[in-house]
């Protein structure tokens, strides 16, 4: 299931469509030339028209979280391949952080700390006078929003260092 054309939310919707009723999720991701060349998706004329063209544009960790929202990246039934060249180390780091932050979210929910964590994150953005990042549009069918709870924050700020290190190892 190869997908890539537009925003992370658009491709996430496509991934969920292609994976519906399948025993496993095979997510083959194509990136746009802006991402592949490591460019900032700026409003410069030579870049703006290429954003999301022939691939998904990923320039932040939040973009990666939105792209794979609703898929448990550490599950043996989820396989991800990415067509990347030059920015491979950066894209791989974003992917690994997305997978770890998903597991931080899972841990906080299992420990009954999720609602308090959401309030803490909300307060953080309010105090900073910033709008919290969000998934643009409605979640596609089959997407439970897993992985979106840490938009705008890193999992290492939400749990004790020992817990975070254990989650990273696992």
Across the structure, where does each feature detected by a protein language model lie?
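Catalytic alpha/beta active-site cores
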Residues: 1-170
């Amino acid at each position: 299931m190869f997908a890539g054309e537009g925003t992370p939310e658009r491709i996430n919707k496509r991934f969920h469509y292609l994976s519906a009723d399948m025993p496993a999720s095979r997510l083959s991701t194509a990136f746009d030339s802006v991402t592949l060349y490591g460019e900032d998706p700026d409003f410069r004329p030579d870049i703006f028209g290429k954003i999301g063209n022939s691939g998904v544009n990923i320039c932040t960790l939040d973009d990666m979280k939105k792209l794979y929202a609703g898929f448990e990246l550490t599950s043996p039934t989820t396989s991800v391949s990415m067509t990347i060249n030059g920015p491979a180390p950066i894209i791989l780091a974003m992917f690994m952080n997305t997978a770890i932050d998903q597991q931080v979210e899972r841990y906080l929910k299992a420990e009954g700390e999720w609602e308090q964590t959401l309030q803490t994150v909300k307060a953080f953005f309010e105090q900073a006078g910033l709008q919290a990042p969000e998934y643009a549009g409605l979640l596609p069918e089959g997407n439970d929003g897993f992985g979106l709870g840490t938009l705008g924050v890193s999992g290492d700020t939400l749990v004790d260092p020992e817990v975070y290190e254990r989650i990273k190892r696992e």
